[in-house]
Amino acid sequence: MDSLEKLAKDRGNFTGVILGHENCPQYYRQSYVPEMVSLAVENGFDVKVNIPVIFEDFLDEFKEEACRIIEEYPQVKIFANDWGMLYYLHGRYPERTFGAGKGISFTYADNPWNEHILLAEKEKYQEALKAANMQNPDTIDQMKLLGIDEIEMSDLELSEGAYKHMNDEGFIVSVNKGMTVATMSRACHCLRFVDKLDEMGNCMDYCTKGIVLSIKDYYDMANNDHKPVSPETKSIQPDMCVDGNITMVKNIQPAGDYTGVSCMIHDERIMDI
């Protein structure tokens, strides 16, 4: 909320804001989304709201929340991060368009520790893996069928072709500048690392303070010893920012060619890493 209030006073070149969370319902619950939507709309921002990946315990709550936003703020765009929510919203509001969040666009290539595996594959398999998901004709057909006209994607060199392809298919492509989502899970990474799982539901302070994981050593099982990682290994294991149940990497190998990208997203969660 503080960041939004500052932005409302001095927006610079920013034209819109993205609220909510890609994957953590607890983060969403604690981040004053209704109040921020109201403030952002009042200040003339283009507003997008990420509805997190919906786990079973939160299904009814976030169905209701997504519908509430749509009906109270028809100018706000809902970004869903799982296919179940997209199917539900399209069935409820068949004439409305939606966005696909990073929970939908997340691909094999987004994982920094997979890149050396990817590059070791034969070229035809590399291309197949890089195209998986966002350049898959069946995926694109489903997105169009569900009324999706915009997609959020990570900033990744291996996705350059996907940006252009998605744009050519008629989608608005938004890219998180300098940021790649590395993992998305059900369990909360953040509370696990600070050993505070009993504080689930009252835990947002741990995310806002920021937790950075830096891999410096590895366990040598044969010799029962810890050893420093090599520079080569470190180059493919960059520092990661933990945010609830996702981890993000800043500038692994950002894209150099943004052909087809309509909007660059500046994510405050990684700005200080």
Q: What spans do the regions from the language model cover?
A:
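Active-site catalytic motif of lipid deacylating hydrolases and related acyltransferases
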Residues: 40
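Active-site pocket-lining/capping segments in soluble small-molecule metabolic enzymes
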Residues: 1-36, 45-273
